Each structure stands twice: as C-alpha cells, then as structure tokens.
Amino acid sequence: MRRCYLSSLAPLKIRLLALHLNRQLITMTTARLLFLLLGFSISSLELTANDRPNILFCISDDQSYAHTGANGDPVVKTPAFDRIVKEGLRFTHAFCDAPTCGPSRSAILTGQPIWRLEEAGNIHSTLPAKFATYPDLLQKSGYSIGYTGKGWSPGRLEPGGRTENPAGPPYQQKRLQPPFKQMRNTDYAGNFATFLAQSPKEKPFCFWLGTSEPHRGFESGAGKRTGKDPSKVIIPPIFPDNDIVRNDLLDYFVEIEHFDSQVSRAIALLEKSGQLDNTIIVVTSDHGMPFPRAKATLYDDGSRIPLAIRWPKGITQPGRTSDALLNLSDLAPTFLEAAGLKPPGMMTAKSLLPIFKNQASKNHKAAFVAMERHDGCRKGGKGYPCRAIRTSDHLYIHNFEPTRWPSGSPDPSVCARAIPYGEIDSSPTKTFMMEYRNKHGIARLAELAFGMRPTEELYDLKTDPHQMNNLAGSLLLAKTQATLRKKLFDHLKTTKDPRVTGGLVNWDHYPYYGVIYTKGWTVDPSPTSNIQSK
C-alpha cells in the first residue's frame, strides 16, 4: 500500500489532508482483512451501500405457471406480476426444486437440491443449521433482513438447531380484513412497510414476502361472486370439464389475485421511498396448483411456476422473455453475486446473472425436480421418492419405489391426515374425480391422478404438454430415454444424491412434525441410524 509522506515544510492544509488519506487507507485495509476473515468475497467491498441492491422476494403458495395474465390466462388478473414482466425479465421455464412447500423453500434458501439437504427434503421436517442460507449470508455482510407471512414452512426449527426462521426475523404484526373467509388476515404489504420504516436507511435490505394464498382451502363461490365467468376458464386436460372444476379454479384465481394485490402494494411502497430502481423484485411461487396430478407431482402442473424479475440496474433489455431452464434454487447464488458475495461451495445451484445480462448460460439447459416424503400418507411414513429431468422437449421421471401409491394410499387409516390419496389436497375437484372415477370420460383422468406409476416415465412435450401419455419403453424414443436417464443420473451422482451414490437414505425415517389425525400413526425407525430419537 502506498502512503503519502510530505515534508514538514508543506502547508498545514496539505499535511492534514495527507494524514486523513493515510487513515482512510488504513481503515479500508482493516475492513478488507476483517471481511476476508468472515469468509466473504472481497468483491462485495467494491460495492457501496447505494450500489448493493435491495431484494424483495415475493412468493405465493401453490401457483402454477399458466395462471398469470402475462403467461396467457384470460381470467386471472395479475397486474403486479404483469408489470414486473413488462419492466423486467419473464422466465418461461422456471421450475421448483420440489413440488412440496417445505422442501421447495429449503432449496430456495440454501441454493441446493433437496437430496443434499437431509431431512429438509421432506415436508413437516426441519432445515439443519449446517446448511447456509442466503438471508443469513446477506445479513452477515451488512443487509437488513426480514420476512412476513409464510417463510420457511411447514416444520419445526429447533430440531435443526435453528432459533429463527431461515427467511429472517418475522414481521407479522399488522392484520387486515381479507376479501374472503379462507384467506389469511396477515397484512403482508403492511408488514413490509413496518420493516422498511425500521430498517437503517444506510443499509441494503433483503425481505421475503410470502403469502399463504392460493393454498387451500378456498371459500366456495368466491370466484363467481367477483364476477368471473366460469365459461372462460381454460380447463387443463388432466381435469374433467364441468362446473365443479370451473368454479374450483375460479376460487383459486381469486386467491392468486390477493397475492398479486399485496405485491402491488409492496411495489408502491418502494416507489414512494425512492428505492424501486435499486431493488431486485422477484415474483414467483413455491410450486404448482393444489389440484390432482399437479402439486406433489413432478409433472409441469406441479413443478413449473411463474417467475418474473425486475432490476433496472442489472437486467439488460428489460421486457425480454427467457426460455432458459432453471430451478428456484438458482436464486440464492444470484442474490449473493448481485450483492457482491461469492456463494459458498455447498451451493450447487447456478447464478442467473449471465441471463440477466442477456448472455448464453451453459448451466441452464435442463431443470431437475425431486420429491421424497410429502404428507405422511403411507404406512410407516414412507414417501414416494422420484427424480426428474426437464428439457425443452421432454420430461423424464424416475420413480424409485413404483410399488407405492404415488398420491398416497387409498386407505385413510395409514395416512397421518386420515384422508384417502392424502398427498392430494382435499377439494371439490378431487372429490368429484374420486366419486365418478369409474364413469366414462373420468376413469382415465382418475387413473392418472390416483393410480400407480411405473419406474420410468417419458413425455414428449411438443405433442403432450400436460404429460398424459407415457412413452417410456417406446422403440421410437429408446435413444432419447437412455440419453435422459444418463443425464439425470450423472447429475444426481455429481451432486451426491444418496439415492444413486449408495449413501445413507433416511427420508422414510426422519421424524414427521405435521399434525397427525390417525391414532397410532408413526414413522418407522431407521434400521441404519438412531435418527428417530432426535
């Protein structure tokens, strides 16, 4: 380091200036050394508080890709999402890491797939403290952090060694009268306003705004009471086309619109405070819609989610659409790199910054989705382990335990929730499909939703966008099937999935912290570890 030495004959003002510069240089050097000792990238020091972007992460609960205005739905109204699309970047092929709440959120927070996260790969579990999370790393580097609504959930923090939600300190005080009864009364945007008011102005912030909508239950008839026309609803071919399903979808749309209204209010707060253009705004969902053959499956209706990002200072040519294939876990390294931090080595997800800059990304040619135990809906707490690779043209799924019921057992006595096919949320659509499953026109749809599945599934997305015709075993696609199988298993080996590397597989035996309605229902203890005694 070069220091300034001046003769004692130099004018006093110049000597005082030189002394000030020396002290500044020493202070900067000390700060750099301290930062390195804390394990952060030196690049973050090159960004001032004004340069480091704020982060507002807005996440709905159970919303499929198709159900926004910008993504083409003619009924649901999402002006906030549509604005982020218009002023930012829309992703057409974003996928959750797992189509179930807790594991998906664990992957988002840690930047890792669920098979690397031990019990966090299950819902109603815990997220071990040894796994670094992006909010914690940002806080250590000088960010204010917080969350409102649904952060990491559902599960228990204490068994994983945590005392605070991984999304940050809670801001839950403000309440409102929701438009319909089944919606939460949390004032999500109001709590964000409280966070902004309490955060030091000189520090950047990272805030998680997570609604419980559109998670079930819904108020029956809510959609029609808002004036929505059931005849205009686009019915996915995986569902029967009738008034029951149409009105169920309308009620779901109303919940999405509540989420969008909260995002709109949050954007207005940023505009009013002058922080909008230095804030990365992300609007997305944790996984797909709470309907049969959607949520808790690896098909697109369960795993493909809306994603739009606005960041004027970091996204070139705003208004673009990207068809890159990505997972939501890619957001963690993206946020860290945007803040000038180097993601820790345990984060295997890949930053989206090259895509922000409209550069080709070799890391986003395929997405990978996985599931272990969703709700405890098989005897002894068994899950339905499966992995998938999604490319632009095909979806390949490998089911590791094809003799198990994929949507939960039809016998409610072996389900913790005491309902048949318990991994599908109760709903008018599910009830209708179960009651009329033997009727003409319903039988095949019911079999797709509730029936058994083979070890391998392969779908041609150009001819079968809702993945209804399994082509695994077809001679015409034998090469494609082999190629995708290899790509999937190579990725699982590289990222150390114990399902394929031969490591300890305990997902069927980790404790279940959800509500148990079935008397005597328990998780079978592990034959290879004492994990049940945790």
Per-region residue spans from a language model:
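Serine residues within intrinsically disordered or low-complexity segments
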Residues: 7-8, 44
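A glycine-rich phosphate-binding loop feature that marks nucleotide/adenosyl-phosphate handling sites
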Residues: 504-508
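Formylglycine-dependent sulfatase
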Residues: 35, 40, 45-457, 465-490, ...
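Short arginine-rich
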Residues: 493-496
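Short, Lys/Arg-enriched N-terminal segments with co-localized hydrophobic residues
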Residues: 16-27
